[in-house]
Curated annotation (Swiss-Prot):
UniProt record similarity statement: Belongs to the ANKRD39 family.
ANK repeats: 30-59, 63-92, 96-125, 129-158
Keyword NAD: no
Full protein name: Ankyrin repeat domain-containing protein 39
SMART domains associated with the record: ANK
Residues that bear Phosphoserine: 153
Protease as UniProt keyword: no
Keywords noted in UniProt: ANK repeat, Phosphoprotein, Repeat
Cross-referenced SUPFAM superfamilies: Ankyrin repeat
Length: 183
């Protein structure tokens, strides 16, 4: 078999001789073309277009993340709202057990956490490390989200992760939050 030749205008990414960093995996190409990239970037128009073309709003990518995970993590409220209204599963879990509520809580997006809870998201779900959304919010010192989660489920204070830590054990030093979680 002959060795691949470069294209007339230089190396092609489909050739083994392509420059490193130019090659993309099929997973990366699927991600960029799929609903996940649109949600990650807050591209509501593209998300709507893909949903209208019968893309499942809860379809996971190769890592188990859904469009709702990406939109929640990046604070794209309108995209989250549209996905939920289009039937996205609010409690879909990644391979590591994270939900969209975990992502919103960790990243400090109170409005999205509130939206997810209003659509029935379960704040008691744990990820592979045994952490709830409260653990994630406490770890980053997000007072408003901790308060919101405790309003929905006061029992979260007593949940220990796989290392036997309570949410209050993960605090970065915020005494107001420590009082809220310890009481």
């Amino acid at each position: 078999m002959a060795a691949p030749r470069p294209c007339a205008d230089g190396p092609c990414c489909s050739h083994p001789s392509a420059a490193p960093g130019v090659q993309q995996t099929l997973d990366e190409m699927d991600f960029e073309r799929g609903i996940w990239s649109a949600a990650l970037n807050g591209d509501l128009g593209r998300v709507k277009y893909l949903i209208q073309k019968a893309v499942d709003p809860s379809q996971p990518d190769s890592a188990g993340y859904t469009a709702l995970h990406y939109a929640s993590r990046n604070g794209h409220y309108a995209v989250c709202q549209f996905l939920l209204e289009s039937g996205a599963k609010c409690d879909a879990q990644t391979h590591g057990g994270a939900t969209a509520l975990h992502r919103a809580s960790y990243c400090g997006h109170t409005d999205i956490a509130r939206l997810l809870l209003s659509h029935g998201s379960n704040p008691r779900l744990v990820d592979a490390d045994g952490m709830t959304s409260l653990h994630k919010a406490a770890e980053k010192g997000h007072v408003d989200i901790c308060s919101l989660l405790l309003q929905h489920s006061p029992a979260l204070k007593a949940v220990r992760d796989r290392k036997s830590r309570l949410a209050c054990d993960l605090l970065p030093g915020n005494s107001d939050l420590r009082d809220l979680l310890a009481s």
